[in-house]
């Protein structure tokens, strides 16, 4: 069983495994398959699981953790790190705490280790299929009111740490200026083809842990891109090193100091994704990766609307590269 390095504990967050298992899948995977994959991941050494209300996988993660305890794979729920997120339809000052309680009911847990604001966008309260109709996007996002709700989740012990997802550097700095409890994490798309240089600099300066999703570009998903897996440079580096292209990408994120989220239910790839800790990229390889052309795979077009807070992709991301 692999041992995964952890981000050291700080005043904002307890120790956090540097590699986590993601559970986002559209179309949705059956709950039985998801739960079985989570159990196998625990057997292989994964201890960090990322879920969200909108993924419809909170129950699967909770069932897998409970079954792992029953089987003796882990001693208790405390042996895993669980992240979930408040979806946009609940990103209203008075709805954050009730939404967090619903997440805990879904998980069958008393707390999550990390609770995130999923996107800096509010939708009309209700349940919508994804993608949602544009008319439910509200014209403004009450960042301060939402964050006060997140802070209350932290105060009540519903979440051991709180953070954000899909926040640009500018929005993160805006949040930091008003937060009583600082965000511990910003979870965003990160891979060699979208390196997040501006945001990473801000996160390092402010002590916010960067957590990367889609580290391989999420090829084959509605939101992903083939640019990473089709990169000739990454293929050459992988061939010369005797590693898979995926391992090159994951090692690159690891060397940046990021927490990274992988998503596969294939056991062989689960194992390969953990074989990134006992070797390094060379300076030349890092330099070649730094020169790769940049392409955002997830622009967030679903949140762009003439009557919403973001009229363009530039508005949503504030020019981050």
UniProtKB/Swiss-Prot annotation:
The lineage of its organism: Eukaryota, Viridiplantae, Streptophyta, Embryophyta, Tracheophyta. May play a role in auxin-induced cell growth by generating hydroxyl radicals, which tends to increase cell wall loosening. Induction: By auxin and gibberellic acid. Belongs to the aldo/keto reductase family. The active site is at 55 (proton donor). NADP(+) binds at residues 214-273. One of its GO terms (cellular component) is cytosol. This is Probable NAD(P)H-dependent oxidoreductase 1. The keyword Phosphoprotein does not apply. It comes from the Eukaryota. GO terms for molecular function: aldose reductase (NADPH) activity. Pfam families: Aldo_ket_red (PF00248). Gene3D superfamilies: NADP-dependent oxidoreductase domain. The keyword Iron does not apply. Keywords: NAD, NADP, Oxidoreductase. PANTHER family: ALDO/KETO REDUCTASE. The record marks 85 as: Lowers pKa of active site Tyr. Its EC number is 1.1.1.-.
